[in-house]
Amino acid sequence: MSYSGIFAILLPYMAFAFLGGATNRLGITRGRPEKLILKFYINVLVPVLIVNYVVGNDALKDIGNVIAAPLVGFYGIVIGYIVSLATVKYFGIREKASAASFAFTVGIYNYGFISIPLTEHILGKSAVGLLLVHNIGIDTAYWSVGIGMLTGFSIKNMKALLKNPPLIAIFASLAVNFAIGGDVIPEWARKIMHPVVVAAIPIGIFVSGATLAENASALIKKGGWLVSFGAVLLRMFVIPALMVLTVMILPVSHELKMITAVQASMPAGMLSIVIVKYFGGDVETAAQTIFTTTIAGMFTIPLWIAFFMRVLS
């Protein structure tokens, strides 16, 4: 697919993020409404979306895919954390909390809101199911290694991971696939789920934009052009290249390689700022990282996806 074709797919979803930001700054979604939307998204919309894409997905009856996908996802996050921690001092960040916040936000990319619709448009519906299983590894790295960087490693973080509704939905859907096989969801249930699935991604992107706008003051207070430069350099260039170079030589399915190409191209995850804020990290550094990589991503995402897919093909 060409640069212009991928950009055309990406643009409406980015518009939802900016719309979410605008409603926050106008006071429409600020505070409690934003938190309610976020809770509804994580606990209801995402689990329904997962069941829709995973149950009955033939690609997920292959045990090789089910094992390899989370491992590749885990690696993609951990390599980002390692590269970020190893280079953070070159971007003017000296304090421990700021370094951890920088590495956390640079290392975790936007692995759901933007990558899911792009994957479906480019690779098809079955690839989305594999991507969601791939995200098990991302969630594991996020809540273990990532939160460990911010707070110290603990069993409590792993317990929080296991109580995560999207993760429960993935494991339950995979269990249905292997135990029963075939698409066990009746047509009438699919029709009920359809509007929920259609709404899930735009709502997720919308609330992400609102959350980022909520912390816009942190972005304004601290210039930090060197931090922004480092975030874009690592998240949008160095880490994607490492991820795709690695997956090129791994004995995994072509579909998983293509999914990695899409995921590697993503900017820093927007909701990471909520986690950094919750655990007492450096919100200013996190805001800069997310904002600058998201803006850069509007132009680099189509470029990288088109290039990576040509290389992997």
Locate the predicted segments by residue.
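Alpha-helical transmembrane segments of multi-pass small-molecule/ion transporters
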Residues: M1-S313
